[in-house]
Amino acid sequence: MILFNKDYAEDLEYMKRGLADGILSEARLEEAVTRILAAKAALKLPEKRIAGTLAPKRENLDVIGCDLHRAWAMECADRAVTLVKDTQHLLPIDPVKHHRVLFEILGKCPSEKRVAERFIADMERKGFEMIPYEEEVFDFSKPMRFETVEEFRSKYDLVVYIGNVENASNKTTARLNWHAPYGAGNNIPWFVEVVPTVFISLQNPYHLLDVPMVKTYINAYSNHDLMIDAVVEKLTGRSEFKGVSPVDPFCGKEYLRY
């Protein structure tokens, strides 16, 4: 068994040459083979192969997504969502008081469309008017006019961010990136003192480090549809927050608590 090889036949030939040249000892090769065979024996793979149970039968897949499993998933989501802080006493949000919601999703991951559509649909069913953020076109070669504070205030009653920055192989960071050259536009949360703002992380529980100005912050740990549903239930006060953070969402920074 050779792991992480570029070409199996090539690596097998290298191993044979190493054995012939004395770089690889017979004892080391025997040890490696013994470990592999022992692992298979411990898992009873030979017996399962003989019994025809090495791979589950296709009909066993029917259990996936059954009512019991869905109930477990809903319970996990309900118990996981964590209110990290709400120092502005914003929650629960109300579809009358906070009717017009500017919605911004960050991450640009493959799941973004699904996540956004699920969250928007959940919120609209609760009676909110969801207004998705549209990236501005910046052309600094000519004079540009940006919204004034009062113009922004008059358009929105609430701003909701969703951090959907998924971890991936060879992805070296899971930080937030903004569509805001020189701090321009409405992607970066300059307006937290103007319009109530809440940040929800569906992946990385440490995003508060990148949005220290946000006063209401929620960690949900997963962008599964049922987790999104649970977040909306808690945002609107239909379910209480039960989650206990498994990490330090304040990243050891006292100022992030406020």
Model segments located where?
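Preference for extracellular/luminal or secreted protein segments
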Residues: 1-258
